[in-house]
């Protein structure tokens, strides 16, 4: 689906006015001398508005999940880049995304998940739209009992579509409609996980967190393994620091992997593996992040996707979805293992929440404005900052 209707409202000069030359220069230095984005990038509402307008709008990012709209007529309202969108599955089971506003007065069309929809009706004046976004009727539009019925009029004010593509379980959107093809954008990441047949995975559960921190702290923490020994005792026991390496960079993708001795330790013993894995792949965990907040971890027996939605400069919503292989996703005999995996991810992320909330508080201090980085561990978090800046040029 192609999108239309989005126009940038800002310029590079707006970005420079918040950052300043010194902060831009500090980001571009070699890592031993560099510092990350300054405090305003984590605390200033004006900066977050620029991120929406210049970063989110111009690239691909995840706005929804196919398991949330499994059947024709299902619809899910979401907030993405600070605006209301509607994700639905039409009568032909095609996934579509629209701006979730009526073309009459701008009322939000759908405010909660719906099923079995035949038509979309505005709650304000009952303008009705098909699931293809086309305008169908406008009651009393020409006066009392003078209804407007629209038939095959390409100029009728239908819902504004958003460019969208589905990759396995994840619905990616590009608001300005100008990004390269999604396959090209994902290719550096897919090279890291090409031995896993993701089509064999099925949704098994979701874990949610509301976190009083900026979305970038969640992503920086996700790709930075330096904190594991101090923050995650169970994870450190699973793979100690001596076996960990810093995250690597491939264009706009930051990625990592490790090899572990026990393929099922701590992750629900007895779960089926992806088909056709090599011996090495049955003992490997791989993960990556994209600059606009989405991450994916792939293990022999499950997948975890990591999705962060910015809400305010100091608040984000984190959603972790777990996918298991084949019948392990819903068969009763795998219920204990499913719960073990979900609890593991819930507990692991609880260990991070207080830490990344403390980073947000720290960014209100004039004693800190970007920090000093570890040349060994912090290349990927610094690259994320640079990619955010580059995406806003």
Q: What name fits each language-model region?
A:
Residues 33, 39, 43-44, 57-58, ...:
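Generic structural "secondary-structure junction" signal
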Residues 27, 33, 37, 131-134, ...:
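Glycine-rich, flexible loop/turn motifs
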Residues 64-71, 151-155, 283-287, 321:
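Short linear motifs in intrinsically disordered
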């Amino acid at each position: 689906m192609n999108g239309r209707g989005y126009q940038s409202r800002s310029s590079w000069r707006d970005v420079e006015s918040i950052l300043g030359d010194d902060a831009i220069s500090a980001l571009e230095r070699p890592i031993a001398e560099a510092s990350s984005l300054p405090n305003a990038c984590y605390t200033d509402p004006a900066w977050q508005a620029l991120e929406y307008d210049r970063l989110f709008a111009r690239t691909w990012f995840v706005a929804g999940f196919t398991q949330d709209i499994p059947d024709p007529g299902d619809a899910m309202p979401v907030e993405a880049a600070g605006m209301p969108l509607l994700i639905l599955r039409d009568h032909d089971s095609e996934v579509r995304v629209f701006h979730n506003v009526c073309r009459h007065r701008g009322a939000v069309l759908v405010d909660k998940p719906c099923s079995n929809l035949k038509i979309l009706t505005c709650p304000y004046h009952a303008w009705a739209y098909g699931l293809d976004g086309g305008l169908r009727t406008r009651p009393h539009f020409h006066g009392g009992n003078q209804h407007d019925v629209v038939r095959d009029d390409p100029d009728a004010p239908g819902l504004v579509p958003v460019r969208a593509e589905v990759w396995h379980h994840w619905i990616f959107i590009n608001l300005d409609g100008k990004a390269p093809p999604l396959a090209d954008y994902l290719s550096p990441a897919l090279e890291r996980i090409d031995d896993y047949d993701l089509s064999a995975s099925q949704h098994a559960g979701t874990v949610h967190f509301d976190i009083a921190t900026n979305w970038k702290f969640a992503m920086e923490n996700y790709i930075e393994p330096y904190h594991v020994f101090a923050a995650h005792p169970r994870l450190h026991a699973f793979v100690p620091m001596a076996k960990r390496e810093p995250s690597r960079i491939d264009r706009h993708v930051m990625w990592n992997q490790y090899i572990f001795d026990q393929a099922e330790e701590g992750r629900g013993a007895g779960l089926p593996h992806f088909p056709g894995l090599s011996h090495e792949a049955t003992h490997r965990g791989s993960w990556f992040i994209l600059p606009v907040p989405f991450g994916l971890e792939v293990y022999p027996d499950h997948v975890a996707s990591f999705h962060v939605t910015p809400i305010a400069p100091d608040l984000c919503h984190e959603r972790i979805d777990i996918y298991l292989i084949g019948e392990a996703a819903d068969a009763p005999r795998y219920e204990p293992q499913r719960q073990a995996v979900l609890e593991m991810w819930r507990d692991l992320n609880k260990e991070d929440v207080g830490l990344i909330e403390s980073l947000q508080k720290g960014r209100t201090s004039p004693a800190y404005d970007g920090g000093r980085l570890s040349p060994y561990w912090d290349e990927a978090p610094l690259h994320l900052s640079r990619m955010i800046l580059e995406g806003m040029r």
